[in-house]
Amino acid sequence: RSTQGYSSAASDVYKRQAEGMKEDKESWRSFFVWLKERGLTGVRLIIGDKNLGMLETIPEVFPDARYQRCTVHFYRNIFSVTPRNKMKAVAMMLKAIHAQESKEAAREKARQVAEKLKEMKLSSAAKKLQDGIEETLTYMDFPTQHWTRIRTNNTIERLNREIKRRTKAIGAFPDGQSALMLVCARLRHVAGTQWGTRRYMNMEHLSKLEDDLLSDIIAG
């Protein structure tokens, strides 16, 4: 089980990996509590796939955090009930939703796409879209400069694929701790050579947005 986070400086990247075989609520709760015990605070947004164990745990451990469903995982879920010969057209329609410049516009676009899917005899795809679209739009409440960075968890997915490739090449491990040591070694390498040399997001945009919201509340 892994998580990746960014500090207020946005040049500090935190990657945490722990051995875990289950995706239930208790496993996620133990993982999140472990992160807090190691000093994690001020979590504002958690990005992930539609994992019920994680979703049930977030309000308990990180009550101030918002949840953003990864748009890529959301698309894949809709593709699971879409005929292969219609996937390209459906993909273009889905991307158009998240290309909108406001949450209201995205909601309206999603409504239009759902109607179009029904016309295409893709009622199951339309239902998945209608049922899940709202939790994919959380990123739109954050600075527009951050949108492309926080609507998916592609960064951690790529890293997880790399870790899987390396562990598969080795084969069997004597125990879970041995595998975890290999994973952590790879994470240290990536953090030191890639993440440590670039700024992932300019967090000044988020600070300004929060200041503006606070001013509106005081004035209102």
What annotation goes with each model-predicted range?
Residues A96-G220:
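Acidic/histidine-rich catalytic cores and adjacent linkers
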Residues D12, I46-D49, C70-H73, L129, ...:
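Short, conserved catalytic/metal-binding motifs centered on acidic residues
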Residues G20-D24, I46, Y67-C70, T82-K86, ...:
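A generic short alpha-helical patch detector that favors 3-5-residue windows
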